[in-house]
């Protein structure tokens, strides 16, 4: 929905004209440079960050005049032209700030002058002073933005005039600039430049100055960051460990590195040039300025504007911020300064895209632990609050980044009270009972079904080479460490105790040195295949490449046949291979693989094909994922025909098969359509206008009868959870004519999941969650077996 733009401007009595920013740039500049009404009158209009002690006497006098009517009586106009007298609420806000002006609890540098030696605390004071200058000016951000656009238009007009009129135009422009130049000679600021600068722009400017200063620690952090990102820097003194992971870039080629230090303006710019399907919507405005409007409460409808990237609530009389602020997950800038807030809602920590958060001059004493999620934050404006001394010390010494990491790493544990249920499925495909665990379900099953069934788990374990502090800045450092995550993975796999385990993103060295000894100890046989690029690397580096693994219980299965598919090379050797531009430019250089095992189920003597894969990650290459699945299914059909000596399509459909893994494909993708329907619609958005030769000509079709095992209860709410993406991309597909689903591992407790912006965390060691299915082998077993003991 394209919401109408909000009304902006001054609040006024009925029948009174709205003050206008009219006239020349000089007039607009003068209006923007006026001091807040009731603070300083009309003197001293230079826009300079004044020291609080210097302006206190004048501010006190002006506030007294506002409250009492002053020497001129109640009708005396106070403040700049065209701006009305501040109302009682605004005057009370000013009075509150003045009463705290010499309070060392609100201004800790008064009690601890050593804070003034910290460039980070100096920046707090500078920007707090800039923020206070806007107090009382309704919609000040909108005014500044209008001024900026006006000046840009004037500059463009001037350039255009220069090009058309030549020397005559230059002479005229020189005459027009004479007043401005003479003003500069008298020591004034260049016209309009400072007037159009918002608090956010001042913040960026000061951060850039700090980054380019001679401070060795700051320069070091910036240099490290500039090696990794072309978009500037994050915050001063960002720990090197967070920005410089020791992972070869080649190993990261299939993972998207998050750019956490893009300015909010750049973010909008990038969205405008992004492909249509990646844009937020057709919304034309993304900022809302409600500054200095004497607001006491916020309407809940405000938080339906989930498209907002900037929200300005400074200079009001707000005493609380509703928890529904968490809905505004696109926010980059939030200004809450100069209100009466006593606390910040913990739900604000869900707005992980915040880059600039200001709450100068409130009554806030602490910062919620949930702010450890705000890993994109570049500046946190907190001066003027009676904050806990420890928090002040951390931010003064380690900057906002250090504070966020402190909150992240020391947050209290969130209990995981409700584990995932195991859902029993009847032979008719209907959910019947829920059990606390897979083991409890097994204990309640009859022997016949136990004999005819097996359990399978699929899990992307998040290879530790991809789990870098830069990629997962929201995860506590101790919970992201490989030692911790590996132990958690071990606990999960052994607790589920499934008959078959299929893992993706398993490092070769970890497979050989950790998983093989561990799984053999628990009576599993082990299979593995690394991604294609391992073949092109030195032996030492190739051990760091990840791949797919299959583990199966020796007392349940016997290996009949093992194979693997390197999608690109498998297609090149296909008898109908034909070079196309899309194959050469888009698919050929992808190194994704699939691991295949034909296993004999010892209790039934039926052979079951188990396949696990991990498709390419990039959503801009959905056509390549479709191609990879097409190649895999075509290859599997050929193997089945060879091993089972069948050519009839109906016979092929009856061969027991499970295909599972991380398909990086959502429910509306061509990949899912291909599995479900056996082909892809020719004009599907994922493959439209793409040409992969024979694969495209036959619409990637296959003759296998496959369904998603979770179709019995509906796909889970998500299988992959990160701050920027939460959805279903992992699946377990099975041959519906020879296997029946008899049980499924359910969803993660929604209340628990809602408290996080992404995984991994202390309970879930990967950004994916495991899927578990119990299959009954139904081929040759026409009798429907009840699941319960009698």
Swiss-Prot record:
Bias category Low complexity: which stretches?
168-190
Give the compositionally biased regions (Polar residues): 156-167
The UniProt entry lists the main location of this chain as cytoplasm
UniProt keyword annotations, A-Z: Cytoplasm, Exonuclease, Hydrolase, Leucine-rich repeat, Magnesium, Metal-binding, Nuclease, Nucleus, Repeat, RNA-binding, Transcription, Transcription regulation
The record's SMART domains line, in alphabetical order, gives:
LRR_TYP
List residues binding Mg(2+): 505
Q: Which cofactor does it need?
A: Mg(2+)
Reactions mediated catalytically: Exonucleolytic cleavage of poly(A) to 5'-AMP
Q: Which family does it belong to?
A: Belongs to the CCR4/nocturin family.
Question: What does this protein's UniProt record list under function?
Answer: Acts as a catalytic component of the CCR4-NOT core complex, which in the nucleus seems to be a general transcription factor, and in the cytoplasm the major mRNA deadenylase involved in mRNA turnover. Ccr4 has 3'-5' RNase activity with a strong preference for polyadenylated substrates and also low exonuclease activity towards single-stranded DNA.
Name the record gives this protein? CCR4-Not complex 3'-5'-exoribonuclease subunit Ccr4
Give the encoding gene's name: CCR4
């Amino acid at each position: 929905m394209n919401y109408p733009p909000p009304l902006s401007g001054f609040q006024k009595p009925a029948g009174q004209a709205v003050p206008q920013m009219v006239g020349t740039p000089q007039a607009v500049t003068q209006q923007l440079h006026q001091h807040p009404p009731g603070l300083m009158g009309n003197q001293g209009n230079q826009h300079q960050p004044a020291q609080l002690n210097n302006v206190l006497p004048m501010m006190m006098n002006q506030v007294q005049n506002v409250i009492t009517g002053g020497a001129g009586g109640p009708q005396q106009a106070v403040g700049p032209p065209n701006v009305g007298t501040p109302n009682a609420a605004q005057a009370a806000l000013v009075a509150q700030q003045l009463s705290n002006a010499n309070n060392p609890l609100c201004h800790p540098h008064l009690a601890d002058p050593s804070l003034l030696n910290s460039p980070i605390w100096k920046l707090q004071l500078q920007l707090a002073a800039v923020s206070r200058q806007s107090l009382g000016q309704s919609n000040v951000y909108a005014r500044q933005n209008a001024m900026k656009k006006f000046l840009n238009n004037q500059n463009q007009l001037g350039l255009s005039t220069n090009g058309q009129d030549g020397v005559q135009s230059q002479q005229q422009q020189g005459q027009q600039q004479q007043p401005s130049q003479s003003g500069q000679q008298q020591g004034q600021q260049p016209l309009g430049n400072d007037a159009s600068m918002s608090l956010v722009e001042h913040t960026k400017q000061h951060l850039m100055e700090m980054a380019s200063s001679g401070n060795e620690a700051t320069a070091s952090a910036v240099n490290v960051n500039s090696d990794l990102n072309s978009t500037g820097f994050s915050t001063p003194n960002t720990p090197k460990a967070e920005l410089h992971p020791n992972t070869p870039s080649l190993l990261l080629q299939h993972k998207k590195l998050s750019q956490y230090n893009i300015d909010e303006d750049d973010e909008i710019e990038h969205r405008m040039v992004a492909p249509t399907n990646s844009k937020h919507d057709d919304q034309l405005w993304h900022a809302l300025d409600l500054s200095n409007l004497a607001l006491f409460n916020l309407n809940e409808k405000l938080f339906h504007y989930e498209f907002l990237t900037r929200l300005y609530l400074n200079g009001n009389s707000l005493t609380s911020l509703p928890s529904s602020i968490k809905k505004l997950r696109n926010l980059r800038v939030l200004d809450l300064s100069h209100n009466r807030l006593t606390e910040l809602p913990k739900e604000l920590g869900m707005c992980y895209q915040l880059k600039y958060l200001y709450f100068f001059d409130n009554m806030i004493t602490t910062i919620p632990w949930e702010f450890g999620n705000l890993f994109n934050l570049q500046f946190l404006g907190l001066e003027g609050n009676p904050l806990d001394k420890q928090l002040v010390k951390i931010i003064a010494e380690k900057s906002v980044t250090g504070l966020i990491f402190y909150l992240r790493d020391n947050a209290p544990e969130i209990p995981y009270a409700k584990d995932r249920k195991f859902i029993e499925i009847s032979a008719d495909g209907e959910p019947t009972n829920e059990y606390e665990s897979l083991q409890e379900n097994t204990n309640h099953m009859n022997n016949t079904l136990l004999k005819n069934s097996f359990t399978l788990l699929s899990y992307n374990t998040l290879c530790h080479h991809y789990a870098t502090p830069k990629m997962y800045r929201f995860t506590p450092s101790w919970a992201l460490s490989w030692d911790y995550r590996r132990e958690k993975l071990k606990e999960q796999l052994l607790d589920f105790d499934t008959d078959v385990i299929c893992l993706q993103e398993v490092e070769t060295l970890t497979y050989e040195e950790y998983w093989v000894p561990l799984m053999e100890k628990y009576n599993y046989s082990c299979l593995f295949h690394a991604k294609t690029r391992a073949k092109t690397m030195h032996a030492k580096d190739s051990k760091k490449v990840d791949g797919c693994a299959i583990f199966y219980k020796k007392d349940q299965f016997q290996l009949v046949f093992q194979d693997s598919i390197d999608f690109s090379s498998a297609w090149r050797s296909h008898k109908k291979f034909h070079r196309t531009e899309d194959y050469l430019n888009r698919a050929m250089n992808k190194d994704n693989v699939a691991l295949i095992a034909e296993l004999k189920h010892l209790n039934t003597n039926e052979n079951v094909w188990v396949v696990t894969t991990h498709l390419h990650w990039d959503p801009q290459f959905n056509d390549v994922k479709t191609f990879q699945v097409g190649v895999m299914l075509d290859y599997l059909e050929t193997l089945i025909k060879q091993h089972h000596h069948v050519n009839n399509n109906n016979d092929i459909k009856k061969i027991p098969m499970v295909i599972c893994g991380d398909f990086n494909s959502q429910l509306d993708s061509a990949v899912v359509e291909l599995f479900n329907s056996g082909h892809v619609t020719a004009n599907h958005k994922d493959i439209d206008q793409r040409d992969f030769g024979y694969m495209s000509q036959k619409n990637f079709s296959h003759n296998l009868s496959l369904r998603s095992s979770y179709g019995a209860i509906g796909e889970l709410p998500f299988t992959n959870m990160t701050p920027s993406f939460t959805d279903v991309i992992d699946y377990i597909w099975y041959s519906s004519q020879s296997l029946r689903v008899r049980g499924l591992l359910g969803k993660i407790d929604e209340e628990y999941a809602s408290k996080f912006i992404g995984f991994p965390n202390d309970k879930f060691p990967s950004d994916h969650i495991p899927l578990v299915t119990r299959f009954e082998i139904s081929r040759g077993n026409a009798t429907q077996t009840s699941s319960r003991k009698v």
